[in-house]
């Protein structure tokens, strides 16, 4: 188990600590089965990871509430905690989540209304 004393740092709020515990519990329970066939079906494994992250509500952190997200606006601390935890469990899980944000972040911040309507809801859903 890695040192998680950083969760007590003052710029993290109780909601961040709860999120870290929630994603860690979820990752321990789900990631091993989700990545079991990664060498036989990499694309399918990534798709399955994103779907599972969506079903669990974690991809909702990659978009603001206006696009179906969990929070009013993107919260970098939440995104970092999710990525750190997923990466600790399996690099492919972090990759699958990160790719969602690489597209949705710029669209959330700078995309047209049409782009936001087209892309953000599907990302939030996983």
Regions found by a protein language model. Name each.
Residues 32-126:
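Glycine-rich flavin
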Residues 1-18:
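Intrinsic disorder at enzyme termini
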């Amino acid at each position: 188990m890695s040192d998680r004393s950083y969760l007590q740092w003052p710029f993290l709020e109780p909601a961040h600590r709860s999120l870290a515990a929630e994603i860690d519990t979820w990752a321990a329970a789900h990631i091993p089965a989700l990545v079991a066939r990664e060498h036989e079906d990499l694309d399918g494994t990534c798709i399955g990871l994103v779907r599972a992250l969506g079903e669990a509500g974690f991809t909702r952190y990659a978009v603001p509430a206006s696009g179906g997200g969990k929070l009013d606006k993107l919260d970098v601390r939440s995104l970092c905690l999710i990525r750190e935890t997923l990466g600790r469990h399996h690099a492919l899980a972090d990759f699958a989540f990160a790719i969602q944000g690489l597209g949705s972040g710029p669209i959330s911040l700078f995309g047209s209304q049409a782009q936001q309507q087209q892309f953000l809801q599907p990302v939030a859903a996983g």
